[in-house]
Amino acid sequence: MATLPRAAPPTPAALLPLPRAAPPLLLAGRAAAARRSRLRARGPSAAARRSWVVASAASSSSRAVVGGVARREAPPAPQKPTQQAADLNHILSERGACGVGFVANLKNMSSFDIVRDALMALGCMEHRGGCGADSDSGDGAGLMSAVPWDLFDDWASKQGLALFDRRNTGVGMVFLPQDEKSMEEAKAATEKVFVDEGLEVLGWRPVPFNVSVVGRNAKETMPNIQQIFVKVAKEDNADDIERELYISRKLIERAAKSFSWADELYFCSLSSRTIVYKGMLRSEVLGQFYLDLQNELYKSPFAIYHRRFSTNTSPRWPLAQPMRLLGHNGEINTIQGNLNWMRSRETTLKSPVWRGREHEICPFGDPKASDSANLDSTAELLLRSGRSPAEALMILVPEAYKNHPTLSIKYPEVTDFYDYYKGQMEAWDGPALLLFSDGRTVGATLDRNGLRPARYWRTSDDFVYVASEVGVIPMDESKVVMKGRLGPGMMITVDLQTGQVLENTEVKKTVASASPYGTWLQECTRLIKPVNFLSSTIMDNETVLRHQQAFGYSSEDVQMVIESMASQGKEPTFCMGDDIPLAVLSQRPHLLYDYFKQRFAQVTNPAIDPLREGLVMSLEVNIGKRGNILEVGPENADQVALSSPVLNEGELETLLNDSKLKPKVLSTYFDIRKGLDGSLDKTIQALCEEADAAVRSGSQLLVLSDRSEAPEPTRPAIPILLAVGAIHQHLIQNGLRMSASIVADTAQCFSTHHFACLIGYGASAVCPYLALETCRQWRLSNKTLNLMRNGKMPTVTIEQAQRNFIKAVKSGLLKILSKMGISLLSSYCGAQIFEIYGLGQEVVDLAFCGSVSKIGGLTLDELGRETLSFWVKAFSEDTAKRLENFGFIQSRPGGEYHANNPEMSKLLHKAIREKRDNAYTVYQQHLASRPVNVLRDLLELKSDRAPIPIGKVESATSIVERFCTGGMSLGAISRETHEAIAIAMNRIGGKSNSGEGGEDPIRWNPLTDVVDGYSPTLPHLKGLQNGDTATSAIKQVASGRFGVTPTFLVNADQIEIKIAQGAKPGEGGQLPGKKVSAYIARLRNSKPGVPLISPPPHHDIYSIEDLAQLIYDLHQINPKAKVSVKLVSEAGIGTVASGVSKANADIIQISGHDGGTGASPISSIKHAGGPWELGLTETNQTLIQNGLRERVVLRVDGGFRSGQDVLIAAAMGADEYGFGSVAMIATGCVMARICHTNNCPVGVASQREELRARFPGVPGDLVNYFLFVAEEVRAALAQLGYEKLDDIIGRTDLLKPKHISLVKTQHIDLGYLLSNAGLPEWSSSQIRSQDVHTNGPVLDETILADPEIADAIENEKEVSKAFQIYNVDRAVCGRVAGVIAKKYGDTGFAGQLNITFNGSAGQSFGCFLTPGMNIRLVGEANDYVGKGMAGGELVVVPVDKTGFVPEDATIVGNTCLYGATGGQVFVRGKAGERFAVRNSLCQAVVEGTGDHCCEYMTGGCVVVLGKAGRNVAAGMTGGLAYILDEDDTLVPKVNKEIVKMQRVNAPAGQMQLKGLIEAYVEKTGSEKGIAILREWEAYLPLFWQLVPPSEEDSPEACAEFERVLAKQATTQLSAK
């Protein structure tokens, strides 16, 4: 065997430059400028300030760069994570996103140019990647290509070796251990497996590299990189050769497990066709690091490239991409369930191609690897088992085919394919752009929601390109014959053997036609048709009551949940947040479900809107045995298909009567006659054994039932969630899970959260028999009948009541799935997407294995006792004749303790209004003596010092500067409340938060007209002072973008991006029309009375790199404002926060689950989000361990009421502290808890003028409160012996457990909260005082530096200029708009800037434009064009000479005009998904759009002169849309929930449409527009007008507008 000595690192001059003439020069200049700016920024502020710079370009300046002075000269290397930091599920520790693409030659001609182009494209997407704390270690970059045989033959010949047999030789790209001895052991072990397999090892080749370009952190973990060549002589078939190499690799991985270096051995690739070069590198240095990639003998017909942005900064070389088959941009949300199900399949997978060796290729997943690595592993298994890459990905990542009229009508075989595999393989669900190649085919596919950008183009010289962005490779546009984009669920493939390019349906039809899937489904799959509900009760009232008591129902559960759902058909809504103790801290018994909190999407993947985007979601589920996924046949279709997992009694009976399922009913009761201790455990073990035996005997359906005609006092029911989870886990561990489905037939399930838990832990369906009986009982009660008879309640039949209940449950399930960004119930089933608070490891290991439970808690015996405490109530002699009210939802005497209670409110009001220290002391004592309510109540401060005089402690005025108020929107609360809070915070130097909804510009200037506490400027307030300002220092950017204008942003000290809200994380919001007064409508650029919808996700944040882009945009328009990102506490938040820090945020806010809300479903308030104590601890520790803590201020909020809360939060690492509900109480809130009704009795949360007039608050009250809190902090610091709050921040060693003994806290472990990862290098004050993070050199600076442009802005003149633009130039014109908005406001600029750009614009082109800015782009643009624009004109046209037809080409990306409040946009060509999403007042014309056009639109006008995608106008409550429908296909694509479709009949509408097209033609020269105007009379009838209710009476929409207007005038006169 021959080896080649490792090459010495070459000199920089020897490195091959990327061949792009203009951009590198431009970028180099910016990089130099960035370095100069860093040098100028050294030294924290005047005293201690540091500036973090992230440059805009794909160059060395594109990474975070650190400069400055800290407590020591050189920052330390990141510490390796401790065991405590790793106390999370491995899955949560690796999240990310990226930029990807491929280049392919249709003639299969290999060339070095392809590799060079791929490297160039990779370099131009550096901004989509991330770097570690050293700002130099890339999160990962890589390239996959064909094996470069010419290069390897050249090497072999130089070594005196024979040339390789290219057909039969495999090449392994191997990461080996660093240690020399371990490396030799690994090589020997590898060779042994190959030899044992009958393969010939030809030799090892050390891969030549240049280590000087590797970052410091990446260098520490850099492997020894070598290639191994093996000959597979025993196989002739090419697929068999690949399969033999796959088996060998699996055997090597298995053999390595017995060695200490097992985790250090990794095959990037092992194939005769493809090879992967990757590492923890930045894009631009991949080609400099691997010297092979500079060698012109490296030739390939294709190349896939990938740049990673990981939220985790600990370098892990193997997780760089591409993987062995895939390059993945996105995140798999269902990964835990996918891994569980793949583990379950290991015993069932069989295929002749494996020749009986299936057991040797297990396991099929690795929880320690990333989601991308596991998806790649599964796809590779299918590929090596005989599937094509396209087929494998159709199985794993199916499109949303159910609501796709084109597929169902034109390609029924494709829908049959998806229906067949729906029952075999749960979808790997989540945002995903997947590029793939097996060496013969290269392609790309997009997830069902289309959540990642994917543009493609084809040239006349036979090249195909796919990339996350356009403009990454210089292109002669005259050669481009096709420009398109992948829409949701779409696929494109290039067959390198035949040169065919297959687009979407062509690919899928070919795959789906291979087998008669439709015939198999018709013959084998049974569909359960809906069965009628029972029409009478089956229990008497006393029996119902006994069951309800035994199974833990309260009167609130029945009246506020079940009955409300039965009556209304939707989940009940409540407000003010969850202020009762966690279940484990409560002194009252709780159902097992209450120990579980739903997880939710934030930052790394988006939530989904289940109401407006329901076409991508499904609750369908199949029952029965899941077959062998590696084989295709009719037996796999032998299942029962359910349309929903919620069954009534008749539907359950149908399942039980299905003989093919061989159903087995298992009773879930345990016997306590021999004592309680151990009985629950023994019964569950026996239950698992019974289930095991039943499945081995052929049962395909296990029904776990607690149904009993006569419950017995000594045989309580096992909590059904515990039974389901235990059997689910047992069957997985014993290889039986695929053989049977689990159905729960239970009394203990009535809320949507209960259903979600059961399904999440393994149940396929649930029959809630007692809840349904409760619905029937309610409907037949005299009270209900009387209410219906008197018109005080909607009239429903007994069947409708049950149907309404199930409808509400199904809607609630969709919402819970959508919070996590999951579309399919089949993917949610068994995915365990919950966090546990209060269950011990014994319980978790038994039934909920893999779920995160950080604080421990109840044992099985304790859980049994809690279960029994409900059960005995039903059988005691003094059993109540009605259900008990536990007070879990509403505060009531004798009920559960609520932190926001009337007594607390009265004591606080007394203290702050009287401004007496002793009154505040009484308030403090009340809080100190309350029952344990939150985790921090279990902790107290201790000191390692003697007390000091309070006079030595920093002042209260200094402390209050760290205080903030929560983001409460003007609209949810009244103007009076909003302004009073802002004035108070400005007086003390703290910060108020605008919340969503904007702000009146009148508030941005200090008051100078105050007399006797009143001001004509703000006449509705009292207690004012001259010098007061009502501006909110923190201005919020939420998903609805309401009120977000350029002027709003430039008047912010800080800008908060609200990702999630503690009381309802993962959900959007809706301001009801009754709260949208004329004033609110003006601020939100809407009409009075129009409901205003905020989407669940930000539609420009689907991943971590998207968040980085929005932060970049905001820094662009206001470079002086710090950008904050608000997250909600959950397991894994530390990893997310690391990504947020790397995304260049200045501040991270952690919110607890107990924060307030104006309105939210009860299940969300109660069951989503976690305590901030855990989230803050994890975030602080993770940031410290990753070397990122100094970059960001940590702010925390959620239930803060006192100085004690501040002190504990400080010790846990927080720099700043947020107060929400208590601030409202201080300004007058009386906790009526009816915020969502608009009937607040004191006008705090109402827009009704007569109620607002009752507002009692004055700013001074809130000032007094915060000063009291600060003095409390001072007194505590003095007692602790510390002079500054700085000195205790992060000092968890100053915390200790209180000596409190509660019934359920005996086994709680607070070790995680008390653990310490060390302190940051800087003090909190230094971190808080550092400069705003910047974008580095940007094109806007060049524009603003132009003397003519500067003069035009300063003196309101007209100027025309032109600039070249590249994809690395992002948010172009945002900085210019900010300068104009700061000087003139949103509408005051009278000058005119006419700027033309030539080239490919980066993301957010033309964002935040103001009137007077006329921007023209000749070329193409990426995502977010016109984001937040308030005026001006934005035109995008292709270059003059193109090889494609402009109206057929995608010319701009996704999510254009997001939140636009004015201006005009004209695009000659097509746009991507979500064009004009949340458009307020912008007018736009485009020649075609993707899905979700005009979503959530509230104003403006959009004209589409071509095809639109699906789900048009979903959530559209204002504005008008005109869409040309030449082929009569639009009607089924429109979401008609709100809008109506009509032809353009109104003369004003015709004029508006024609006028916009005329302007469009003038600006773009569109041939399509010219043709329409030329034949206007023929085209006009082909247009549809989409009209929401708010526009029905407008002159443009109402053909009889004049008559309607006259009628309204007559009515008004009559009224007078």
From Swiss-Prot:
Its main location: plastid. Pfam families: GATase_2, Glu_syn_central, Glu_synthase, GXGXG. The active site is at C98 (for gatase activity). Pathway: Amino-acid biosynthesis; L-glutamate biosynthesis via GLT pathway; L-glutamate from 2-oxoglutarate and L-glutamine (ferredoxin route): step 1/1; Energy metabolism; nitrogen metabolism. The keyword Oxidoreductase applies. FMN binds at residues 1176-1233. It is an enzyme of class 1 (oxidoreductase). GO terms for molecular function: 3 iron, 4 sulfur cluster binding; glutamate synthase (ferredoxin) activity; glutamate synthase activity; metal ion binding. Residues 1-97 form a transit peptide. Its EC number is 1.4.7.1. Mostly in green tissues and lesser in non-photosynthetic tissues. It is found in: Plastid, Chloroplast stroma. [3Fe-4S] cluster binds at C1229, C1235, C1240. It catalyses: 2 oxidized [2Fe-2S]-[ferredoxin] + 2 L-glutamate = L-glutamine + 2 reduced [2Fe-2S]-[ferredoxin] + 2-oxoglutarate + 2 H(+). It comes from the Eukaryota. Binds 1 [3Fe-4S] cluster. Keywords: 3Fe-4S, Amino-acid biosynthesis, Chloroplast, FAD, Flavoprotein, FMN, Glutamate biosynthesis, Glutamine amidotransferase, Iron, Iron-sulfur, Metal-binding, Oxidoreductase, Plastid, Transit peptide. NCBIfam families: PRK11750.1. Monomer. This is Ferredoxin-dependent glutamate synthase, chloroplastic. The gene is GLSF.
